[in-house]
Amino acid sequence: MKMMIAIVFVSILLLMFSLSSTAMGMETEQQNMEERADVDFTGIADSIIKKIKETNAKPPARFDPATFGENED
């Protein structure tokens, strides 16, 4: 019985640690996004700024092995 209580207690502690680590990671990511948004673009051409914003809006590229093996004959 005591062993079961100890296991439950340790499990709860691990869960709390995991959730707090996730929250801290999300907070750091939010800060990074805010810092990127605060970039000063004065003196840069509008076309370059437009391309930067379009690139940042795209989802990250993923490697798809199915398309890699296809031949374009």
Curated annotation (Swiss-Prot):
The keyword Oxidoreductase does not apply. Its main location: secreted. GO terms for biological process: regulation of blood pressure. Disulfide bonds: none annotated. It is found in: Secreted. Keywords: Hypotensive agent, Secreted, Signal. The keyword tRNA-binding does not apply. May potentiate the hypotensive effect of bradykinin. This is Hypotensin-like peptide. The lineage of its organism: Eukaryota, Metazoa, Ecdysozoa, Arthropoda, Chelicerata.
